Amino acid sequence: MITTLIIIGAAFLVGPRTFKFVLAYLLGYYNAFGPPLQIVQFMVWLIIIYFPKKFFSLGWYFCHDAFSSYFGDPNGGQLPVSTKFHSLTDMID
């Protein structure tokens, strides 16, 4: 356990990317599964830790039609953009 904490501390000092990689490795290493599933869990942790925006935007991309048909999406997935004010001076007037 002390060795693990030393490795985590050293990875934190090296940089954020190394820290995330070591964290994903340790989360995949300490689990209840055997070695084949440890590799799968490690890859899943890498995806979740390194690519959260891409991971969730991919889910939104594939499920957007289901979300929009269920919740009713008047903008077709686009953010509402106000065209009332074109600059800060228009907003003040």
Swiss-Prot record:
Name any GO cellular component annotation: membrane
Where in the cell?
Answer: Membrane
Keyword line: Membrane, Transmembrane, Transmembrane helix
Keyword Transmembrane in the entry? The reply is yes
Q: What highest taxon heads this organism's lineage? A: Viruses
Q: What membrane topology does the UniProt entry give? A: Multi-pass membrane protein
Any stretches that span the bilayer, and where are they?
5-25, 32-52
Annotated protein name in UniProt:
Small hydrophobic protein
**Organism from which the protein derives:** Tupaia virus (isolate Tupaia/Thailand/-/1986) (TUPV)
